[in-house]
């Protein structure tokens, strides 16, 4: 591997620090941890103190006085200071709605954690996909360049033969057509690799100078990983139990269930213990220059009787949403199982496919050599040679694609069962040089 080549592990640690989608998930998890604290607060004591101080108060008081059957209005002016202090502590003793909200808040914290883990898993898959896309495209570029060199040599040879009177314009035109098509494909591949590089650069927070900085697929024998467990039913069982999207769907369903209980609590009474203390001086117009102190301890009971049918409607609504979340969970499970089976089939049949493509490449090489000899002997035309070269070119492309398809399928298989980690990244990294 060149000293400057960037490995998948290098990009993995950079992506953890710089990928904006994953960093958003980190903050979502931090925010989600507070759900439980918010829910618990509704079951804990509530203490409040109110203080009011008015150093200057003015009052004008006018009242009539009867003097010898005459009414006289007397006016008095007062300037006084007033203050009041109130302290209240309350503790819920029975509040079914608040308790249901607390249980929901615990599940919301678990849901936020599941979302974080799922985003982390998706980060690894996106990194592998983008890395493979760059590596795969650069392999196709190398094949394309090699094919162009072959066509250019054949074109030069055919032009010399034509000048000597042994070649034909048809051969030259056929080669030029193949060459121009290959050059057009090369331009498309350059755009494709630039797009893949930009996606990868966005994840790691820095621009990749050139695609040559990505390690290439190794030239050594491509060794498939053993599937452990080796039966699909166990993979399916593990996915149903551990898949992060399925876990999140279960949490969503549990939250919807608690929403039903929260609305059910609107039918129940609430009971609170409370204690209050107040101290005041001239707190109102009728208590000027009077000081009061009072303390109260007791229970507060509230019983809902009728609220226009709101609670009943909310119960029906939350029940429907709970049923909806159950169907959404089932849909997610079905989709995951379909994808799991598809990726499992790719992994389990890749050895057959790779052997077939390797044999196809070997056969195409033999056919090309035989066709070239026959062309020299006058038994085949230049078109036959070009077709044989095209067949080899396609077989090599199919072989490379099958290798990358296997790597992606193997990674997805472990993502669906929540077993994709740095160790799996190291295994994938070993396929590149």
Task: Label every model-predicted segment.
Residues 3-52, 58, 91, 208, ...:
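Bacterial Sec-pathway N-terminal export signals of envelope proteins
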Residues 10, 122-238, 343-346, 350, ...:
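Periplasmic alpha-helical coiled-coil/stalk elements that build and connect Gram-negative outer-membrane
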Residues 23, 46-64, 75, 79, ...:
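Small/polar (Gly/Ser/Thr/Ala-rich) solvent-exposed segments
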Residues 24-39, 119, 123-142, 153, ...:
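Amphipathic alpha-helical coiled-coil segments
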Residues 57, 208, 398-433:
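Acidic, low-complexity, intrinsically disordered peripheral segments
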Residues 65-71:
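Solvent-exposed loop segments that connect transmembrane elements
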Residues 83-87, 235, 295-301:
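Hydrophobic, lipid-facing positions within transmembrane beta-strands of outer-membrane proteins
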Residues 189, 244, 402:
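Metallo-beta-lactamase
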